[in-house]
Amino acid sequence: MAKQLVFDEHARRSLERGVNAVANAVKVTLGPRGRNVVIEKKFGSPTITKDGVTVAKEVELEDKLENIGAQLLKEIASKTNDITGDGTTTATVLGQAIVKEGLRNVAAGANPLALKRGIEKAVAAATEEIKKLAVPVEDSNAIKKVAGISANDAQVGEEIANAMDKVGKEGVITIEESKSFDTEVDVVEGMQFDKGYISPYFITNPDKMEAVLEDAYILINEKKISALKDLLPVLEKVAQTSRPLLIIAEDVEGEALATLIVNKLRGTLNIAAVKAPGFGDRRKEMLRDIAAVTGGQVVSEDLGHRLENVTLDMLGRAKRIRITKDETTIIDGMGNQAEIDARVNAIKAELETTDSDYAREKLQERLAKLAGGVAVIRVGAATETELKEKKHRYEDALSTARSAVEEGIVAGGGTTLLRVIPAVKQLAESLEGDEATGARILVRALEEPARQIAANAGDEGSVIVNAVLNSDKPRYGYNAATGEFVDDMVAAGIVDPAKVTRTALQNAASIGGLILTTEAIVSDKPEKEKAPAAAGAPDMGGMDF
């Protein structure tokens, strides 16, 4: 396909039109009084949302050059969303402001590369200032506020904080769709993995179709168990203690499984067997996690262990084990806390280095099972459209709460971005030429989120921004929900995670700087529409013979 090349001012202005198209659709959602955007779907009912990244992702422009600008701005929103789960609209508004002010200066003859350097230096100064303003999250009340603001719903904030209280800050919280109208929080206590009993003969409670073992030993074996002679010594030792036994192995089959079932049915030994969770190296690591939680050892040939030589002190212990057809839950494992902490730290170190989203998700699950537990928030609603929108708000609020725990919270409502302006102005005075202009571009952009929040609430943005900038109170700001100024935004519960504010600014400046330094665009040439086929002669009735 033939390509079209566009240069200089024409290229940059085309990108700007695309940026504005996305930003204008997204920015109406900003703040407590932001408006909804309705998105048409080819199949099913339309989506109604106040989420910036959801709106941005739906925008496709007909003009190919403008569409490139739109895609670049969408990148700001999606990158911010990937890292923090929130702040996408703020990032979009900042990006639009940087592009607008920057292109005005480039058109006036400024050096784009010097402007970009100035913007980058200003962003570094601003992010340092944001870190200084951050307040650590000490209690669930702060989590409740920050999650509630993200979702625009105090009830959502309360449920996220409630779930975090139950499973701890490291715990896994999943959001699922409920079959009923109500939203409820379920907590899975203990360590759970998705493998159930190998045979239904191990069931102890036929009404609930589950096996429950109280104060049980746990044999953790890496390989398959099929020969009875290997298993017999450990069975005899456990039988002498009159305690139940859970066997976790790659598989239990043949005469070994038959013997376990016979002993269970005779009442000689209360026993159950489940397959080990995971596959390959991940299975080995998960077995080591179970060993740490229960205070046992993994029986592995790699470590020189043989099944027939297993002693009671190599077995794990737990106060209660519940096994269903699909999952096993170990409650109150008797592991050594120091060993569990060592496993947690090892997983955290691995999380820092992994690039794969799938690996990160699995590591996060393992971390939760070791550190706290798993909470499931089942979101209920009256209609499918409401359910989708509500579930999305819960997911955003959860990501925001996690970001708040990581780097603390700052004053919301665009106030923090206004508070870092003096530091950026000070930097601009130390720079020269177009670099100083670049820093001043960021100063103007930092005002834009607060202006937009005020505008969406029906107020005059410039008046609000000037009032906040002229105040000597460090957390003085504007509550757009009530239309009043507040002496301390953090105390009033109007907060944002510092990580969200920082990431939004960094991503906006990164893509904004790239657009300013663009000198040419290469894109596909629009295809010419083919002329319609000629109609038949009139006297032939429009038909061919």
From Swiss-Prot:
It comes from the Bacteria. GO terms for cellular component: cytoplasm. ATP binds at residues 29-32, 50, 86-90, 413, 479-481, 496. It is found in: Cytoplasm. Gene3D superfamilies: GroEL, GroEL-like equatorial domain, TCP-1-like chaperonin intermediate domain. One of its GO terms (molecular function) is ATP-dependent protein folding chaperone. Its main location: cytoplasm. CDD domains: GroEL. The keyword Transmembrane helix does not apply. Signal peptide: none annotated. Residues 532-545 have a biased composition (Low complexity). Its EC number is 5.6.1.7. Coiled coil: none annotated. Pfam families: Cpn60_TCP1. The keyword tRNA processing does not apply. Keywords: ATP-binding, Chaperone, Cytoplasm, Isomerase, Nucleotide-binding. GO terms for biological process: protein refolding. It catalyses: ATP + H2O + a folded polypeptide = ADP + phosphate + an unfolded polypeptide. Residues 525-545 are annotated as: Disordered. Together with its co-chaperonin GroES, plays an essential role in assisting protein folding. The GroEL-GroES system forms a nano-cage that allows encapsulation of the non-native substrate proteins and provides a physical environment optimized to promote and accelerate protein folding. Forms a cylinder of 14 subunits composed of two heptameric rings stacked back-to-back. Interacts with the co-chaperonin GroES. Belongs to the chaperonin (HSP60) family. NCBIfam families: GroEL (TIGR02348), PRK00013.1 (NF000592), PRK12849.1 (NF009487), PRK12850.1 (NF009488), PRK12851.1 (NF009489). HAMAP family: CH60. This is Chaperonin GroEL.
